[in-house]
Amino acid sequence: MTKVAINGFGRIGRLALRRILEVPGLEVVAINDLTDAKMLAHLFKYDSSQGRFNGEIEVKEGAFVVNGKEVKVFAEADPEKLPWGELGIDVVLECTGFFTKKEKAEAHVRAGAKKVVISAPAGNDLKTIVFNVNNEDLDGTETVISGASCTTNCLAPMAKVLNDKFGIEKGFMTTIHAYTNDQNTLDGPHRKGDFRRARAAAVSIIPNSTGAAKAIAQVIPELKGKLDGNAQRVPVPTGSVTELISVLKKNVTVEEINAAMKEAANESFGYTEDEIVSADVVGISYGSLFDATLTKIVDVDGSQLVKTVSWYDNEMSYTSQLVRTLEYFAKIAK
């Protein structure tokens, strides 16, 4: 049994516990978050985006009892002071958003944990993993890795198929992305000074940046410098879609692209020919769900622009990928 600790019990941390409860061989034995335990339990049980937890959670002194099993709860600001060694923690899922650098994340290792998976993009000194794209880059010697971002987990499988089958010369991606906690619910000063994220999240389409296109080079090195992109935050609480416009090294047809995507489908990369909308992907476990109905090609005098589209639940799709990465990472470390 792989013992897991979750540091940071926010959107991703809470959904990670839900997902891990469904995975044989993984057990969450501890959670660390500075928020009051009763508040955390309430937010875990009732979720406006993902629905009510299909199980039981109780709060006791220093612990949650989840489906009859005790999970220790800490409120320690310094991860180096956490009792990971005493608890025999194999992997920490680092979900606070504050410990995204290798040196900071290694505080968990100094506290006695064996490995750390960061639920956010990290520096170039760490391996960035998108499961079923480049997880085989891990050799078991790593102590800290990054699980990339939700958008990179959506983009990477689609980009990998295009690059492997047809070659990508260059491209530009746009994610039409649900709003998140780094935006304001009503107009007001933004903590990072962002004028657009200072505006009410649920009433506007809000242009934003994304590092997903450039970060793809950490997952697929052949694409370094070939992709860029941006984001448009839209008034939905979860459920997003990524559009990739690319110039390929060979001319293709819509049928050839869709066939290649269908052939590549797996637990991380789904394929659909249904005419779905964002509400239909809330709660899916695919990190990326390719939509064959939206593949388009513009051909002018033999020069092509190719548009491919993939859906994702920026919460649960990403969390599912993180848990797959964590499980794989733990196994190769032993």
UniProtKB/Swiss-Prot annotation:
Annotated D-glyceraldehyde 3-phosphate binding sites: 149-151, 180, 197, 210-211, 233
Taxonomic placement: Bacteria, Bacillati, Bacillota, Clostridia, Eubacteriales
Any one Gene Ontology BP term: glucose metabolic process
Source domain of life: Bacteria
Marked site: Activates thiol group during catalysis: 177
Pathway: Carbohydrate degradation; glycolysis; pyruvate from D-glyceraldehyde 3-phosphate: step 1/5
Keyword match Nucleotide-binding: yes
Name of the protein described by the UniProt record: Glyceraldehyde-3-phosphate dehydrogenase
Biological role: Catalyzes the oxidative phosphorylation of glyceraldehyde 3-phosphate (G3P) to 1,3-bisphosphoglycerate (BPG) using the cofactor NAD. The first reaction step involves the formation of a hemiacetal intermediate between G3P and a cysteine residue, and this hemiacetal intermediate is then oxidized to a thioester, with concomitant reduction of NAD to NADH. The reduced NADH is then exchanged with the second NAD, and the thioester is attacked by a nucleophilic inorganic phosphate to produce BPG.
Subcellular location, record wording: Cytoplasm
Gene symbol of the encoding locus: gap
Cellular component aspect of the GO annotation: cytoplasm
Keywords: Cytoplasm, Glycolysis, NAD, Nucleotide-binding, Oxidoreductase
EC number: 1.2.1.12
SUBUNIT field: Homotetramer.
A GO MF label: glyceraldehyde-3-phosphate dehydrogenase (NAD+) (phosphorylating) activity
Record-linked InterPro entries: GlycerAld/Erythrose_P_DH (IPR020831), GlycerAld_3-P_DH_AS (IPR020830), GlycerAld_3-P_DH_cat (IPR020829), GlycerAld_3-P_DH_NAD(P)-bd (IPR020828), Glyceraldehyde-3-P_DH_1 (IPR006424), NAD(P)-bd_dom_sf (IPR036291)
Catalysis: reaction(s): D-glyceraldehyde 3-phosphate + phosphate + NAD(+) = (2R)-3-phospho-glyceroyl phosphate + NADH + H(+)
Family: Belongs to the glyceraldehyde-3-phosphate dehydrogenase family.
Binding site for NAD(+): 11-12, 33, 119, 181, 314
